[in-house]
């Protein structure tokens, strides 16, 4: 374990200067893709995505780790309500696991949403991660099998990051379910996936953008998303090895946002350029920009993930 920690610290120190700004990235406006009410502009690493300094040291995204059995998720303990806001993670390899705030874990006693970005180092001990409930009304004695539920949409992620308030998260989920008039039988955020019409629309969007990403150069590390006259948000990661395994769940989250509140694209390029310039000009500008419009996750001073959104007042 000490051997691994030494090399992980070395990796962080060696890469600490490579922050997620225009120094290392560029926004590929010429490769923007648009389908119906969603426009996506890829963000690329200069000089290609490139292999990380040491592939064995790079964290594995949660969805990949779950599918490969590198990590398991269980309830923290009994049905006591003090356990609602925690999940227990156990790693089963020598690789760290990267968990992103806004990812949804389905099952257990109720569906949950990860509160903040976290890196789980390999350990034989239990590790506990803070979560919020996104399934009001079910806290069952019987546990369902845990599964991966994609990223939440941008509105719900904003409420999570700006309030960390369980009641406001439930209200936002309820608002979305009511506004969408989804054919479902619960108050769960994921219940919209029971609606056949929703699934058909979502699949149409997903196939279009998934195909575009599959056909472009593999140096993309993030993207900015637009609908109507506004920027929905952006997600940028430290390398292709983190971005591509999370591409599908990220797309599902942004597509869900557009299905619920998207409008025909009217936003011109200049406001997008100003938005991205403020975000990527340099580290100081980035820190100031995300103060009320997103978050930056760092590990040892090294930026792992930048997520932004359009500031709006959360549901009260």
Feature annotation, model-predicted:
Residues 1-21:
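Bacterial Sec-dependent N-terminal signal peptides
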Residues 19-92, 96, 102-121, 126-316:
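Intrinsically disordered, low-complexity segments enriched in small/polar residues
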């Amino acid at each position: 374990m000490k051997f691994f920690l030494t090399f992980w610290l070395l990796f962080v120190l060696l890469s600490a200067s490579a922050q997620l700004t225009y120094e290392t990235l560029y926004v590929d406006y010429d490769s923007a893709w648009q389908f119906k009410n969603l426009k996506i502009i890829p963000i690329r690493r200069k000089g290609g995505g490139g292999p990380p300094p040491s592939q064995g040291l790079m964290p594995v995204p949660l969805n990949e780790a779950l599918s490969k059995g590198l990590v398991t998720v269980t309830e923290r303990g009994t049905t006591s309500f003090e356990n609602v806001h925690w999940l227990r993670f156990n790693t089963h390899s020598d690789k760290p696991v990267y968990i992103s705030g806004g990812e949804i874990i389905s099952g257990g006693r109720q569906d949950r949403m990860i509160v903040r970005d976290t890196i789980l180092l390999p350990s034989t001990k239990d590790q506990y991660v803070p979560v919020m409930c996104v399934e009001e009304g079910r806290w069952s004695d019987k546990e369902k099998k845990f599964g991966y539920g994609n990223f939440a949409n941008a509105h719900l992620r904003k409420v999570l990051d700006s309030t960390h308030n369980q009641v406001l998260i439930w209200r936002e989920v309820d608002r979305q379910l009511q506004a969408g008039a989804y054919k479902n039988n619960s108050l769960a955020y994921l219940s919209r996936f029971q609606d056949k019409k929703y699934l058909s629309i979502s699949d149409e969007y997903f196939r279009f953008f998934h195909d575009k990403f599959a056909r472009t150069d593999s140096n993309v590390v993030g993207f900015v998303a637009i609908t109507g006259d506004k920027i929905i948000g952006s997600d940028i990661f430290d390398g292709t090895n983190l971005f591509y395994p999370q591409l599908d769940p990220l797309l599902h989250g942004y597509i869900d946002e557009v299905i619920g509140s998207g409008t025909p694209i009217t936003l011109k390029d200049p406001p997008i350029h100003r938005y991205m310039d403020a975000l990527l000009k340099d580290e100081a500008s980035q820190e100031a920009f995300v103060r009320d419009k997103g978050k930056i996750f760092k590990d040892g001073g090294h930026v792992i993930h930048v997520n932004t959104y359009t500031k709006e007042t959360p549901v009260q």
